[in-house]
Amino acid sequence: MADEKPKEGVKTENNDHINLKVAGQDGSVVQFKIKRHTPLSKLMKAYCERQGLTMRQIRFRFDGQPINETDTPAQLEMEDEDTIDVFQQQTGGHRI
């Protein structure tokens, strides 16, 4: 029984953080560890820096829904190992 209590303590500690995958359109996957109540803007900016992109060039989606910079993993009910999809911002239109 004494062995069970430390395991529960470890679980509670890890519960504050969540591992998220960010999948690019090119098939690349970058993993991040973030606190459940930290705004996702931190992850989004880190991803952009790592990929040499700006926030204006790409869009982040989770379960098909756009992610706002102020959203947190807890608000979006994200679970450990969930994947965020990244899409290049569509630019252009038609030629006149």
UniProtKB/Swiss-Prot annotation:
One of its GO terms (biological process) is chordate embryonic development. Interacts with sae2 and ube2i. Covalently attached to a number of proteins. InterPro entries: Rad60/SUMO-like_dom, Ubiquitin-like_dom, Ubiquitin-like_domsf. CDD domains: Ubl_SUMO2_3_4. The keyword Nucleus applies. This is Small ubiquitin-related modifier 2. One of its GO terms (cellular component) is nucleus. There is a cross-link at G93 (Glycyl lysine isopeptide (Gly-Lys) (interchain with K-? in acceptor proteins)). Its main location: nucleus. It comes from Danio rerio (Zebrafish). Pfam families: Rad60-SLD (PF11976). Belongs to the ubiquitin family. SUMO subfamily.
